[in-house]
Amino acid sequence: MNIINAGYEFMTHIDGNEVLEKIEQAGRVCYKSEDLITEDSAKKFCENIIKRGHEAVLEHYSFTVKFIVDRGVSHEIVRHRVASYCQESTRYCNYSKDKFSSEITVIRPSFWRDNIESNDEYVKFAIWERSMCDAETAYFELLEHGATPQEARSVLPNSLKTEVVMTANVREWRHFLRLRTSPAAHPQIREVAIPLLKELQEKVPILFDDIEVE
């Protein structure tokens, strides 16, 4: 069994200036003010669009992110309906095969430490780890007895690693990040959403600056 940390990666190259320029080009059609486009007008235009709440304009730019998370977190991600998804399938992936190193991969819980010096947390982590091993054993035994992957997956845990590719427009990403960086969100989705937000704030001026993490 392999234990890894949750993470994400961009599948779209993001040029912040290009993003703003494309949004400005689309948005100025509304006002027929294309003649006001200059080399440095996009930033101010997008700032005003957000202040006015005219966020439909932000739908003219989309980008793609691949999340590496557990199955539980993936169910929260795909609830965002204004997006397109591809996800690793436990129906078709047979984790006994060599390309999976003949083992299941699970996501390390962010809320329990595998540090023996923190006794209470370590006990919880040890119980979790034991249950993951038991699930892996049961899964492989079912396969050995002729079960198909889609049948054997019924014993796989919520902590099983999955990869979810999400493509959404800027408006939906803003909505996603507002919800999933909130203190009310699940700790393990915040684990990927907060660094994603911070990276986007560095890559793209204006568009995500008003989203604050508590």
Protein language model regions, located:
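Family-specific signature for flavin-dependent thymidylate synthase
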Residues: 1-214
